From Swiss-Prot:
Disulfide topology: none
Topological type in the membrane: Single-pass membrane protein
Keywords attached to this entry: ATP-binding, Cell inner membrane, Cell membrane, Ion transport, Membrane, Nucleotide-binding, Potassium, Potassium transport, Transmembrane, Transmembrane helix, Transport
Record protein name field: Potassium-transporting ATPase KdpC subunit
Biological role: Part of the high-affinity ATP-driven potassium transport (or Kdp) system, which catalyzes the hydrolysis of ATP coupled with the electrogenic transport of potassium into the cytoplasm. This subunit acts as a catalytic chaperone that increases the ATP-binding affinity of the ATP-hydrolyzing subunit KdpB by the formation of a transient KdpB/KdpC/ATP ternary complex.
Subunit structure: The system is composed of three essential subunits: KdpA, KdpB and KdpC.
Subcellular location, record wording: Cell inner membrane
One GO CC term on file: plasma membrane
Length: 189
């Protein structure tokens, strides 16, 4: 019994520290130093309505919008509670059929030349909010035609919303799909 008492006390102490004090402290620091990120990097309109997050992709399939990277999350696409890829190998016949269908859809939308991999294949998380600038620019002609605006206006908007590598060296340039689509709506209103 004398060996069990210290073990139980340590268990209770570490549960309080690791399960209560530490998470509360880290959350408090995050809210103090990074309030926007701690709340999910939400995009909120002028009326206070949440439109989405800079960190989670959303489905867009209408021709007047920038199309995101495909999502294969469980139940429905871009489901943040079921983040994950399909785990299908690149030689899986179902996977190859799905990729071929996506490429066909992109070709039918007017896209020519090499199709960037990110427009035909889902990511590991299934929630990517970004595209490469090249993948975004390839969609400019379709978006401009659907909206009845010059392609140069769409290209300019994509360029304005292109972020470079993090800290100048980490990753590649990227375009946030939701941010561009929200700004596209302001161009044609």
């Amino acid at each position: 019994m004398k060996d069990i008492k210290p073990a139980i006390l340590l268990f209770i102490m570490f549960t309080i520290i690791c399960g209560g004090i530490y998470p509360a402290l880290v959350t408090g620091i995050a809210h103090a130093l990074f309030p926007d990120q701690a709340k999910g990097s939400l995009i909120i309109d002028k009326a206070g309505k949440e439109l989405g997050s800079n960190l989670i992709g959303q489905p867009f399939s209408a021709p007047q919008y920038l199309w995101p990277r495909p999502s294969v999350t469980a139940e429905f696409g871009y489901n943040p509670s079921a983040s994950g890829g399909s785990n299908s190998g690149q030689t899986n016949p179902d996977y190859l059929k799905t990729v071929a269908e996506r490429v066909k859809t992109l070709r039918e939308s007017g896209m020519t030349g090499l199709i960037p991999t990110e427009l035909a294949q889902a990511s590991a998380s299934g929630l990517d909010p970004h595209l490469s600038p090249q993948a975004a620019r390839l969609q400019a002609a379709r978006i401009a035609k659907a909206r009845g605006i010059p392609e140069t206006a769409v290209q300019k908007l994509i360029n304005e919303n292109t972020a470079g590598p993090q800290l100048g060296i980490l990753g590649a340039a990227r375009v946030n799909v939701l941010a561009v689509n929200l700004k596209l709506d302001t161009l044609t209103r």
